[in-house]
Amino acid sequence: PSDRFQTKHLIEALLKDEKPAYIRTGRNPVEDIYSEDNCPFEMDKATVIKEGTDVVLIGCGEMVRPCVEAAEILEKEGISATVLDMYCVKPLDTEAIIKAATNAKAVVTAEEHAPFGGLGSMVAQVVGANCPKKVVNVALPDAPVITGNSKAVFDYYGMNGEGIAAKAKEALA
């Protein structure tokens, strides 16, 4: 989940569900994306935070906030971005990905994970099979990484609003 409000909704939903579940959260506090009064949540469905036309930014967990920041940066440069909060990767909301990506020019995923076998790989498969276009994954390197709090690590690897916006512009070029 991307913030405390979404985490609360997710836990409440899981308490009513008989299936096994796994939740991954960071240990550091994160800035809220949602509020008590505005936290759209549907089990196993991505949340559209912002609708745009040029590029789709798909984040999960702590990487949703940098996607929102990237969309704000891009908007100042005349680039319209959709932002999807993909809080759940299993099952993956393929319908939301296809709907968002179909008319966009490119897709950028952002995840606190290695570049292989995670959100980026799954989104690339869905987009490639249904609405082919460039997919760029912003992720940790497939190698040992530096240690530190989330912000320090994300900034070091360009996994922040500026870095995601730059990757989106490269994908659109």
Give the ranges of each region predicted by the language model.
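Conserved thiamine diphosphate
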Residues: 1-16, 172
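Thiamine diphosphate
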Residues: 16, 24-173
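A short alpha->loop->secondary-structure connector
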Residues: 19
